[in-house]
């Protein structure tokens, strides 16, 4: 957050700054979103909602995935959170056991490693510099994986850099991960084996 505060100071002084802190867009909230918020307030939608999302919101998510991606889900498979950080924290708490590793490309949002540590895991930081447009390569991903790898963070568009992986780049990363098979007869007896990437 110190980076964000410093960027704001420099902007106030007239400097042209690209902030790599909070990851906020450089445009205002679109009017139709502002109006929807006003309508919701006028309709009295100002109380606590179900933790996992309202039925109407869950249905909108179901409809979106069906329409845009050809995927079918039920409301019991949808969990709405207040943002990406909460979702990542929830994932870590639910999936990480002691010393499980989480691969995190850097630059990353400041709290990602701490959320892994709070869950008892070990962050594995993969440096992705400006020379590679702040994107992790398949070779870097392969080198970061171990028998203890439980999660891989892939944030696109990236917060804080804004870098976006192309479809080809995502496929290449997916090929590295596709050869991994996790079996879990019990939560404490996990094994990982390699399978051909065509599997």
Predicted regions and their residues:
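Aromatic/hydrophobic pocket-lining residues that form π-stacking "cages" and hydrophobic walls in ligand
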Residues: 3, 7, 112, 173
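Conserved small/polar residues in nucleotide/adenosyl-binding loops
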Residues: 182-189
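Glycine/Thr-rich phosphate-binding loops of Rossmann-like dinucleotide-binding domains
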Residues: 28, 88, 112, 161-162, ...
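PLP-dependent aminotransferase-like
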Residues: 75-76, 93-154, 164-168, 175, ...
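N-terminal small-domain helix-loop-helix segment of the aminotransferase-like
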Residues: 1-83, 90
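Flexible low-complexity scaffold tracts in large eukaryotic assembly proteins
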Residues: 156-159
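Secondary-structure boundary/capping motif
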Residues: 29, 49, 133, 161-165
């Amino acid at each position: 957050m110190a980076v964000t505060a410093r960027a704001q100071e420099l902007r106030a002084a007239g400097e042209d700054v690209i902030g790599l802190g909070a990851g906020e867009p450089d445009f205002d909230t679109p009017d139709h979103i502002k109006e929807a918020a006003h309508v919701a307030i006028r309709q009295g939608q100002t109380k606590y909602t179900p933790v996992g999302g309202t039925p109407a919101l869950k249905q909108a998510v179901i409809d979106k995935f069906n329409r845009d991606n050809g995927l079918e889900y039920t409301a019991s498979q949808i969990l709405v959170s207040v943002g990406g950080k909460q979702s990542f924290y929830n994932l870590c708490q639910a999936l990480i056991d002691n010393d499980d590793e989480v691969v995190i490309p850097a630059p990353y949002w400041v709290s990602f490693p701490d959320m892994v540590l709070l869950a008892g895991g070990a962050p594995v930081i993969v440096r992705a510099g400006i020379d590679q447009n702040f994107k992790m390569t398949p070779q870097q991903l392969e080198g970061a994986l171990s028998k203890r790898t439980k999660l891989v963070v892939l944030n696109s568009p990236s917060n804080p850099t804004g870098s976006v992986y192309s479809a080809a780049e995502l496929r290449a990363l997916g090929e590295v991960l596709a050869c991994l098979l996790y079996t879990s007869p019990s939560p404490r007896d996990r094994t990982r084996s390699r399978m051909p990437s065509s599997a």
